[in-house]
Amino acid sequence: MNTTLEYAGFIPVSAADGPGIRSVFFFYGCTRNCPGCHNSDISIHGRGKLISIEEAVKLIDAGCRNRRITISGGEPLEQPEQLRALLGELRNRNYNICLYTGGVLEEVPADILDLIDFVKTGRFVADLQDGTNPYAGSSNQHLYSVVDGMVSNMVA
């Protein structure tokens, strides 16, 4: 297993990246190339900082005061082994975890769903920006609650 992930940044406090006040950890790299993406500057793989899963957990533990974390990017699902390892460590520390992906719900592996509490899905579509969803950039994106690995309902 690859225990080094490509990392873009960390925000200690955000009210826009999932339910409640959360911290946000950004994976580096995304091949979706959504026109108008607000994180396009972190899309090209190979340009991010390489850190170990252990270093990522230490960074999150030090900066996330309320145990609510959103994993975003880039596209976290493009580093699946590293994502699983990080989510497993965070779950073991009782974090409330939200995963942001530009993919559809069916692209989120079951073993990833087992490790998270929320998932935001959908590509950013600039023509669908309407401001109705506080957790997404366009109206085709949705936030779902996940309970025991099962998607239970759409939150937004």
How would you describe each model-predicted region?
Residues 6-33:
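N-terminal pre-triad scaffold of radical SAM enzymes
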Residues 117:
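Receiver (REC) domain switch/active-site residues of two-component response regulators
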Residues 2-8, 21, 39-99, 105-111:
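Conserved Radical SAM active-site core
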Residues 15, 110, 133-135:
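Short secondary-structure boundary/capping segments
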Residues 77-88, 129-156:
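P-loop/Walker A phosphate-binding loop and immediately adjacent motor/lid segment at beta-alpha junctions
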Residues 101-103, 122-124:
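Short secondary-structure boundary segments
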Residues 11, 120-123, 147:
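Residues at the C-termini of beta-strands that transition into short coil/loop
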